[in-house]
């Protein structure tokens, strides 16, 4: 009895896919180069990928520089988080197709660990911290707590007075403490080469200065001169302005020729309504 055996042939591949390849050479090349290939050498990572579209096939080569950087433990743990969406199959770290690195933004802390506020002084370029109590800003010229010595509006006046005092001391040193023919000490103001002066004659003009606060932002020097000129002769008007924006800070100093005029200006203009604000006029504090 004869026995016949039938062998089952393997199924034919999809003809549509074969016709799309075009040739067996391209099919072999596609199997060989299919998917991305990565190679790392001397800290340089090269990723080669083949992209096909209607216009043809393109070979994309991306080069990365591998840098080993030590980071804190929380940062390293965040990089291991599971990705989602279109990036769920990507490896750890940023991917060029979905992530790009923007410019670095530095964080500036305005308080230290003790909770004290830190201020940055642009003119001196030093950083200091304030304490929780007491006044921080202080001027060594006019003794005011509103500004620093470097930005004092009366610094030139005080410097001139200091130069005059230094010249008078040098002159007194040359003349000597005694008068010829006498063994007694004579005060500098009682000597023959200098006229006798009183304390009122050497009174500084800053004592004739009043401080004006709660000023409107659009108020200028001419408007203040016109307002305070109704009381007396105004020698100087200084409006404090911000050094970065050049906008008024809301206060000014007005210097009169006589102290009585300053007192009259305080009595008349304290509480005066200018635009939509009420002015506060007071003596400049000298301590």
From Swiss-Prot:
Subcellular location: Cytoplasm
Main location: cytoplasm
RRM domain ranges (all copies): 208-286
Span list, region Disordered: 163-207
Keywords assigned by UniProt, alphabetized: Cytoplasm, Initiation factor, Protein biosynthesis, RNA-binding
Gene Ontology BP, a term: formation of cytoplasmic translation initiation complex
Superkingdom to which the source organism belongs: Eukaryota
InterPro entries reported for this sequence: eIF3_g, eIF3g_N, eIF3G_RRM, Nucleotide-bd_a/b_plait_sf, RBD_domain_sf, RRM_dom
GO molecular function term, any single one: translation initiation factor activity
Pfam families named in the record: eIF3g, RRM_1
Any single GO CC term annotated in Swiss-Prot or TrEMBL for this entry: eukaryotic 43S preinitiation complex
Cell wall biogenesis/degradation in keyword set: no
Protein family according to the UniProt entry: Belongs to the eIF-3 subunit G family.
Purpose: RNA-binding component of the eukaryotic translation initiation factor 3 (eIF-3) complex, which is involved in protein synthesis of a specialized repertoire of mRNAs and, together with other initiation factors, stimulates binding of mRNA and methionyl-tRNAi to the 40S ribosome. The eIF-3 complex specifically targets and initiates translation of a subset of mRNAs involved in cell proliferation. This subunit can bind 18S rRNA.
Oligomeric and partner information: Component of the eukaryotic translation initiation factor 3 (eIF-3) complex.
Protein name per its UniProtKB record: Eukaryotic translation initiation factor 3 subunit G
